[in-house]
Amino acid sequence: VMKKSRISLLWQVLLAIATGIALGQFLPVPVARIFVTFNGLFGNFLTFAIPLIIIGLIIPAISDLGKGAGRLLLVTAAIAYGSTVFSGFFTYFSGRAVFPELITESAHTAAIIDNPGNMALKPYFTVEMPAPLDIMTALLLSFCIGLGLSAVKGDTLRMAAADFRDIVSLLIAKVIIPLLPLHIFGIFLNMTVSGQVASIISVFVKIIVVIFILHILLLLVQFVLAGIIGRKNPLRLLKNMLPAYATALGTQSSAATIPVTLAQTIKNGVSKNIATFVIPLCATIHLSGSTMKITACAMAIMMMSGMPVNTTDFSGFILMLGITMVAAPGVPGGAIMAALGILEGMLGFDETAQALMIALYIAMDSFGTACNVTGDGAIAVIVDRIDGKKENLMQHS
């Protein structure tokens, strides 16, 4: 077991996709159905767990924001949210322009994603696992309680929420993430047997290329803005952040990259106080790269399966996604786990679409994370400038 867990999640998922496709060519149906049965159970368990994940992550995230370091915290959170939402809309409109050329809706794929019942292999049995709460109920409840906790002085519920967050984080880290590769293996096995894996893989490759280009453009926009506001050279700022970018590619975790991000941000001339405050905070709340990937993948999967992609649905989705990303834990695959709720609740993604979404997301987890942490450096420059202005005003008055 120890050996296996040393392989990063990315490689586990890529391995799962490859073996799923390879074994799908010749695995006898009765054997393949065992994996498909696991998919049914795991998919149902995810449906059950998603509202709990939402409540466990969002309540403490919001209540902590409310009671924290006051003004500076709100400024940073607002900028991080704005950056995340901008990333979502930037991706959405780029996707509208580019994807229709790249993604042809194949009737076969559409039939599969719209209705997994059309898959070639059926599970031996299924166990219904109804969710304790509806997705929207969970979101609203989390906002009400989270905002309430930040206003009320009560510690009992706040500590309970923190404990519940720890439980949910354990659930994600010890149960869901380790089983994900097996889940993805089963989905790709089933799609191979059903004969439409080639069309899906070709779309995957195209999307990954598009997102790679988009995330570079996004970083340029973020740093040009930071350069204008902070009156510094944007390209020099960006060049200084490259070690953080490279580290994040390797670790695939914003949290693990903090020391490097911090050092490079200070090198960019951000005051030490601000940097030590903004960088760890942004590692958790600023996920513009993840938002970009989730938005683009969601669009692609919807286009592939012939679901209508319209701006009103996506606007609501992106605004919610921003909040969900603020709450998402900084572990590999954490963002997509937190986002499953609104993918299901607002865009109507079923289990198969969700599994494709997870596979596609994790397949490029590294440069999404790299985009997140590099952008943190830009936010630090902006917050430093805003804070500097405030201090000057205080001194003059």
Where are these regions (language model features)?
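Membrane-water interface of transmembrane alpha-helices in multipass transporters/channels
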Residues: 34, 70, 74, 197-205, ...
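Signature of multi-pass transmembrane helix bundles
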Residues: 3-28, 40-49, 71-236, 396-397
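Alpha-helical membrane segments and immediately flanking helix-loop junctions
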Residues: 113-115, 238-295, 322-336, 363-382
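Transmembrane alpha-helical segments and their short flanking loops
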Residues: 103, 295-397
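Transmembrane helix-bundle signature of multi-pass membrane transporters/permeases
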Residues: 41, 45, 58-59, 76-81, ...
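Juxtamembrane helix-boundary/capping and inter-helix hinge elements in multi-pass membrane proteins
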Residues: 28, 62-71, 100-104, 150-155, ...
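Short amphipathic alpha-helical coupling elements at transmembrane boundaries
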Residues: 36-47, 159-174, 239-247, 263-267, ...
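Membrane-interface alpha-helices at helix entry/exit sites of multi-pass transporters
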Residues: 70-76, 170-177, 267-283, 311-312, ...
